[in-house]
Amino acid sequence: KENKKNLGYGGNIKKCLNFSLKKKFDYAVMIHGDGQYDPKHIPSLVKEISGDNTIGACTGSRLLDGTKGATKGGMPYYKLLGNILLTSIFNFLLKTKYTDAHTGLWGYNLYNLKNRKFNFLTNGYNFDNEFRFMNILKKTLIKEIPIKARYGDERSQLHIKYAITFFINTILFFLIDKKIIKINKFK
């Protein structure tokens, strides 16, 4: 069902998660609508999060098996380098080991969301980044499975703005993690 008002990227995910919780589903899946991610990976995502409530989510990683999952599908090299750089900064500052922090394929274990304040997270494109950080603070795992993605000729205008926001948020998360600053929305 189409939204009457544009809720933003994060707003749409929150709507999906709230709907799924209200219906008492066990899992929810988010897949970008740009056709880059193959829905055939959905059963693998759900398999990874089912039956283990220490796992908050599972993502499809284009880089878990090196760069083949990204480059074979036609990922532009500037996107690949940006993804690797931003994910590496996130991992270094927050002591994590993600391979693809910018994926458009997520499976959510709803058991872990029942008492989480995810509705306070951004409605924008950095929802995934904030969600990932919230799980780090709660000591809930986010697993990754290897996937391949397909890229067309589409162009996006948000790359630089997204990258800057992601970088600033990662510094902010580091400061919160080190208890230098406190922001309640991540509790």
Specify the residue positions occupied by each region the protein language model found.
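Hydrophobic residues at beta-strand termini and immediately following loops
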Residues: 1-3, 145
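Hydrophobic helical membrane-anchoring modules
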Residues: 93-96, 119-187
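Active-site loop/turn elements of alpha/beta-hydrolase fold enzymes
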Residues: 33, 62, 147
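An aromatic- and histidine-rich active-site surface loop
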Residues: 35, 44, 129-130
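Acidic, glycine-rich active-site loops and adjacent beta-strand->loop/helix elements
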Residues: 33-36, 151
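Residue-level signature of catalytic and energy-coupling elements of molecular machines
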Residues: 16, 34, 109, 135, ...
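Acceptor/aglycone-binding surface of glycosyltransferases and processive sugar-polymer synthases
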Residues: 3-22, 27, 39-125, 152-161, ...
